[in-house]
């Protein structure tokens, strides 16, 4: 029956149903390190966060090799690094380099209406250049616009909500889970057709809430003596060649999604499609061209440094390794350690519970990589795109909304979240701690998500 959860994909060599919850300890460890060390051991963390990430990666990799066998363990680690981590870093790194070569010049002043325009524009652009591309393009001019303001933390929190996550819900280009769904057979325009109303409602409500909060903060800033500088600089975009290079990155993503050569290469037991190799080589070439063709003064105007992308690369190395057994347990479905959670998505009569699909996919996406989480629940819902796009369209909506929208709940829910925070910290913008951010996200986003659930899924 299509209403029965399908067999979930198992990576060759690892049976997720045989793994207990203790295998999740390294993943919990790296999450707690990211959350607590900056609070209680800031100096140690700043100097050693890369070593901490490697430590937790070893805490996962060594037991995998010792308990499951050396070849099984190394195959699993090599697979996640070559098939997932390296392409991920190449993609976000290329966007970071290219977007960092575009300097938007102008006398923008961080008034509430200007900030709302930035956030709204970013939410739209995220669907065409991805959440990472839109975030990296707009974060620097937004920081410049708000440079003179004292109370501005809320602007960058909502930037993560809207530009780095919710905004990218309309196309497969917007967010990795939707692109993965596209590769599995979901129509390119299906997401725009079915998620347009949820996107409009969620984005509209968040922009309205932000406007109210920022207006109150702006009045206090003015009362404390903030004066908007005279708007004298003419609007201009420096490093325009990078706009073309950014279009090239988008084109490479589309090529890898639409092309089906059937040609594969195998390296260290990992299979690579020709399209994926060409795509990643294009990313590297375009990033290299950006570094060669962009004037040094343009990057200096953006205060461009390598620190944010290096921080992401180091921490996500540990996250990607530690996540291996957790995802295998999730992929094991009803036979794995998360069986009690998985059982919630199916009602007693065999029908799908879309509310639980939404909240479970979303809650796990807030802490795990949202792309494989999307895939796991896509498979639990039957895995047939023809059925999920029609008869069970509401279920696919729930999975898509959960994986994209709830990436905003934590700093690690989506790559641009962490990159945005890293750039803000580097530029002297005070951001909340890991748990401090979650107070904002849970307090603001969850009521909006409950509204989305009631309107579209029940």
What residue ranges belong to the model's regions?
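Interfacial loop-to-helix junctions that mark the boundaries of transmembrane helices
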Residues: 12-23, 44-51, 74-86, 189-198, ...
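Membrane-interfacial helix-loop connectors
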Residues: 63-65, 126, 136-151, 155-157, ...
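Short, small-residue-biased leader/transition segments that mark boundaries at the very start
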Residues: 2-9
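Transmembrane helical segments that form the transport core of multi-pass membrane transport proteins
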Residues: 246-376
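Core mid-bundle transmembrane helix pairs that form the ion/substrate translocation pathway
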Residues: 191-293
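Hydrophobic mid-bilayer segments of alpha-helices in multi-pass membrane transport proteins
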Residues: 22-34, 48-65, 85-95, 120, ...
């Amino acid at each position: 029956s299509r209403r029965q959860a399908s067999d979930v994909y198992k990576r060759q060599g690892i049976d997720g149903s045989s793994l207990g919850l203790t295998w999740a300890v390294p993943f919990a460890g790296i999450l707690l390190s990211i959350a607590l060390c900056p609070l209680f051991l800031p100096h140690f963390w700043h100097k050693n966060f890369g070593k901490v990430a490697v430590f937790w990666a070893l805490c996962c990799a060594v037991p995998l090799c010792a308990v499951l066998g050396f070849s099984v363990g190394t195959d699993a680690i090599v697979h996640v690094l070559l098939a997932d981590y390296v392409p991920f870093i190449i993609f976000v790194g290329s966007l970071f380099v290219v977007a960092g070569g575009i300097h938007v010049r102008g006398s923008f002043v961080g008034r509430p209406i200007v900030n709302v325009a930035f956030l709204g524009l970013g939410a739209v652009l995220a669907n065409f250049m991805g959440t990472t591309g839109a975030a990296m393009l707009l974060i620097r001019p937004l920081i410049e616009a708000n440079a003179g303001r004292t109370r501005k933390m809320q602007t960058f929190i909502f930037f993560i909500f809207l530009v780095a996550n919710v905004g990218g819900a309309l196309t497969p280009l917007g967010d990795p889970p939707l692109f993965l769904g596209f590769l599995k057979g979901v129509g390119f325009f299906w997401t725009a057709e079915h998620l347009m109303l949820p996107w409009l409602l969620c984005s509209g409500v968040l922009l309205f809430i932000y406007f109210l909060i920022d207006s109150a903060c702006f009045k206090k800033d003015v009362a404390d003596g903030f004066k908007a500088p005279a708007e004298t600089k003419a609007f201009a975009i420096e490093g325009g060649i990078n706009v073309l290079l950014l279009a090239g990155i988008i084109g490479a993503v589309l090529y890898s999604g639409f092309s089906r050569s059937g040609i594969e290469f195998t390296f260290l037991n990992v299979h690579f499609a020709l399209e994926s190799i060409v795509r990643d080589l294009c990313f590297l070439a375009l990033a290299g061209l950006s570094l060669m063709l962009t004037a040094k003064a343009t990057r200096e105007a953006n205060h461009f440094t390598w620190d944010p992308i290096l921080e992401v690369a180091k921490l996500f190395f540990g996250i990607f390794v530690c996540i291996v057994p957790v995802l295998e347990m999730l992929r094991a479905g009803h036979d794995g350690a998360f069986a009690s959670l998985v059982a919630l998505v199916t009602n007693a009569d065999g029908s799908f519970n879309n509310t639980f699909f939404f909240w479970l996919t979303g809650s796990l996406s807030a802490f795990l990589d949202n792309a494989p989480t999307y895939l796991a629940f896509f498979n639990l819902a039957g895995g047939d795109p023809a059925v999920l796009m029609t008869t069970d369209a509401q279920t696919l909506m729930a999975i898509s909304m959960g994986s994209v929208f709830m990436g905003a709940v934590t700093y690690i829910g989506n790559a641009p979240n962490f990159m945005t925070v890293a750039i803000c910290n580097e530029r002297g913008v005070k951001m909340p701690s890991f748990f401090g951010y979650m107070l904002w996200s849970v307090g603001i986003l969850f009521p909006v998500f409950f509204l989305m659930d009631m309107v579209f899924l029940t």
